[in-house]
Curated annotation (Swiss-Prot):
Proteolytically cleaved by the viral protease during capsid maturation. Its main location: virion. Homododecamer. Interacts with the terminase complex composed of two small and one large terminase subunits. This is Portal protein B. InterPro entries: Phage_lambda_portal (IPR006429). GO terms for molecular function: DNA binding; structural molecule activity. It comes from Enterobacteria phage P21 (Bacteriophage 21). Forms the portal vertex of the capsid. This portal plays critical roles in head assembly, genome packaging, neck/tail attachment, and genome ejection. The portal protein multimerizes as a single ring-shaped homododecamer arranged around a central channel. Binds to the terminase subunits to form the packaging machine. Belongs to the siphoviridae portal protein family. Keywords: Capsid protein, DNA-binding, Viral capsid assembly, Viral genome ejection through host cell envelope, Viral genome packaging, Viral long flexible tail ejection system, Viral penetration into host cytoplasm, Viral release from host cell, Virion, Virus entry into host cell. One of its GO terms (biological process) is virion assembly. It is found in: Virion. One of its GO terms (cellular component) is viral portal complex. The keyword DNA-binding applies.
Amino acid sequence: MKRTPVLIDVNGVPLRESLSYNGGGAGFGGQMAEWLPPAQSADAALLPALRLGNARADDLVRNNGIAANAVALHKDHIVGHMFLISYRPNWRWLGMRETAAKSFVDEVEAAWSEYAEGMFGEIDVEGKRTFTEFIREGVGVHAFNGEIFVQPVWDTETTQLFRTRFKAVSPKRVDTPGHGMGNRFLRAGVEVDRYGRAVAYHICEDDFPFSGSGRWERIPRELPTGRPAMLHIFEPVEDGQTRGANQFYSVMERLKMLDSLQATQLQSAIVKAMYAATIESELDTEKAFEYIAGAPQEQKDNPLINILEKFSSWYDTNNVTLGGVKIPHLFPGDDLKLQTAQDSDNGFSALEQALLRYIAAGLGVSYEQLSRDYSKVSYSSARASANESWRYFMGRRKFIAARLATQMFSCWLEEALLRGIIRPPRARFDFYQARSAWSRAEWIGAGRMAIDGLKEVQESVMRIEAGLSTYEKGLALMGEDYQDIFRQQVRESAERQKAGLSRPVWIEQAYQQQIAESRRPEEETTPRET
């Protein structure tokens, strides 16, 4: 019987079969035959090694400069030196009049600024942090521990106007009592209901070494009124995830290897720099060990002493020197080897750059930012790299920093309204009926890094003139609040007029000249080839 011809690939497999998904196969040449990872949920993969993984990340951040720089980049680009509020209650949904809502917004922002950035850290129950420092710490902890815990507390002993305080809680203190295994409804210190929603958290009271307390406290997720009793911020990647995964998991092995590699390379360079030259002998292994482990006999019969005396006598007689350049003669069988450090790199720089690029990709930052090396990058490449990193930082600001900030602000606003410290305008819903509408806010952090300040300003002004942007968005990119800038400009303009100073016209003329030059055709500004 004649068979129907079938097209096959290089392995003899029918072509139609080879065109299907091959991720579950052995791979070309069998490379994936032993790659058999189990299909696990996020909690099943993360929680058994959570404490060890976080401890390793802590160690890297404390003792590795690259890891410490990665955390600092998250703090500086996501938060910056001041985390400013732009309060935006949903006044239409709440049924407020726009003019009344604007006055209410101004009063809330002024009161929040005084409370949040107090000079003695009044917002912190420990008295150590301002609000911005809370957010910076939270972003840093989220980078190397994967989550943030902040506990709102009520201070009944304070003499300050507001009694709401916050307590930073280390993720290392949140665990199943006694560091036990837990169960379906108690996972790594988090109690969950049948839907996976957190119900309560178990916190070790004191994790200080040898403190001897070992007591665990159960803190509910929220109080009966709906006020949060524990703020838990992390970005889940899968259904049913209970705890956050730190960002160093994917690059932890490379970071540790790079650390060891750099230390070994440094030791090698130090050894080569310590010795200008060495004299190598052609003693065989047996004789060398015999001399080194000379038998405990009389001085004259000790082989180690005898050979050293011969070497000493020879070199004393023949005056072998290196500083004087001339080396007349060596002991028979010896060899002079000069130690040079010129070849100490041996491809190390290229390997280091490759590892740093891998680590930077895993941490969401650019290679130039992580290594602080801008020597091999052009303007276009630097701006493209900075824009990619900026997009990542903006996502982290929105879903991590701003989320924590808004929840902290909501706890404070609840007290301010409930105790009548701030009188809100008439609304159809009270705070407890529409908590999100009352607490809605945008947050202004660090501005975008300007590669070329002039071009950045030109782009911003052109967008505003073309109706593609606003002063609010443009100044937010610079890390500024447009309302503060406008108020300051009004004050400065009035002071200049009062002092008899005219407006500096040269600023506008210089700017218009720069705009005109930037709009010239490229061939007019570039010298032609002859």
